[in-house]
């Protein structure tokens, strides 16, 4: 069973590259994948989408790293979908 299926929280990030950026679209996406890989969390990557999974705080920090890397590389946006397992502690208000 992949690690992301057992994780407390998983986040799916879709990089929306910009054609007008200095770096080509593929480099914008690769920047996100590299950042995700460097987090050390369980991750899976597709053409423009990647999933990071782990503890809640770890995933939030990883999302920030991936978003920053994507935007720094010229991406126009990053869409994020976060899912928590049923027994995961919720954010306290």
Segment roles from a protein language model:
Residues 1-93:
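Charge-rich, low-complexity N-terminal segments
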């Amino acid at each position: 069973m992949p690690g992301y299926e057992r994780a407390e929280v998983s986040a799916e990030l879709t990089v929306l590259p910009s054609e007008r950026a200095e770096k080509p679209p593929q480099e914008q996406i690769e920047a996100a994948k590299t950042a995700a890989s460097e987090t050390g969390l369980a991750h899976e990557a597709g053409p423009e989408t990647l999933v990071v999974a782990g503890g809640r705080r770890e995933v939030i920090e990883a999302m920030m790293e991936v978003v920053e890397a994507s935007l720094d590389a010229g991406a126009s946006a990053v869409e994020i979908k976060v899912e928590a397992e049923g027994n995961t502690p919720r954010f306290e208000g």
